[in-house]
């Protein structure tokens, strides 16, 4: 509790009480009663606060205070009251006439608590210590089980994380699981096919050709867009020979080819074929010396899906894109240089329109 306001207004004494102060307080309360404790110091002529006078009277100067040690009956009563009220010492003291709360608290902490422990009784719960320890031992396994269950709940996520790490750390080469052909880019810019017969065992059975009901496309489709890029007006460009710009609308041709050996790739530097399990990798030559190939032929990259192939006699599917550059080659000196004023705006407008037409025609054709 905080001090009364009178303690801050004037200088009051603190500490031990002198015999003269005890006599003044005892005489005043005996003759007039204590009344309001805040007014007692002024009426008794003491330089003390009201709280100090009250505590001095209750704990030391009361005529009904019992002096001496506590009897065994009082100790047993204190134990019974503590089991019901706990550490409420003032309420316990009200049940023991002539005893103060301070005396009871000191007796509890000094002697009664030790006696209860020697008897095997917990001073806090007033139960046998064996029961309290067994109860605490039962709580420990439950907490450990909760921790284990929490770890068990976390284990699937960790295992899923390990599974994700297993797949994420693998190289993203789908050719090991599907019928994609691998390409070896040599120094002469030739492309050769390297197949591995051991990859057939890694393909799931649902993706095997025998289990497929039908082929996605029964006949091969060859999409051949022909695009003519406009030349620039710069005289130093090898593609720009004049002020004319010739554009060819995209021409999408759909044709079927019933012969594997008559396609476009037989006369150039591409040796592409559907992976055949009967042919081993030793029959395919990895390195070939090819003739000069046009730049537009390097863009012809067929994309095979092994799961859509029904048998060895099914026809290949490839997309053939050719880009024709129509320009006057008489003044070719520098490739792909653009005019700063007219070339960029004209070509960008033409290309955007041309690409829109290509997208529309390609969507309608497929």
Curated annotation (Swiss-Prot):
Name of the protein in its database record: Transcription factor MYB61
Native organism taxonomy: Eukaryota, Viridiplantae, Streptophyta, Embryophyta, Tracheophyta
SUPFAM superfamilies: Homeodomain-like
Subcellular location(s) per record: Nucleus
Gene that this sequence comes from: MYB61
Residue ranges of domain HTH myb-type in the record: 9-61, 62-116
DNA-binding residues: 37-61, 89-112
Reported phenotype of the disruption mutant: Increased stomatal pore opening. Reduced amount of seed mucilage. Early germination, slow growth, delayed flowering and senescence.
Function: Transcription factor that coordinates a small network of downstream target genes required for several aspects of plant growth and development, such as xylem formation and xylem cell differentiation, and lateral root formation. Regulates a specific set of target genes by binding DNA to the AC cis-element 5'-ACCTAC-3'. Functions as a transcriptional regulator of stomatal closure. Plays a role the regulation of stomatal pore size independently of abscisic acid (ABA). Required for seed coat mucilage deposition during the development of the seed coat epidermis.
Native species: Arabidopsis thaliana
Key words of the record: Developmental protein, DNA-binding, Nucleus, Repeat, Transcription, Transcription regulation
Region (Disordered): 115-164
Record has Transcription regulation as a keyword: yes
Primary subcellular site in the record, as a coarse category: nucleus
Pfam families: Myb_DNA-binding
GO biological process, one term: xylem development
Gene3D superfamilies: Homeodomain-like
CDD domains reported in the protein's UniProt record: SANT (cd00167)
Free-text tissue specificity from the UniProt record: Expressed specifically in guard cells. Expressed in sink tissues, such as xylem, roots and developing seeds.
InterPro entries for the chain: Homeodomain-like_sf (IPR009057), Myb_dom (IPR017930), Plant_SW-associated_TFs (IPR051953), SANT/Myb (IPR001005)
Secretion signal, residue range per the UniProt entry: none
GO CC annotation, single: nucleus
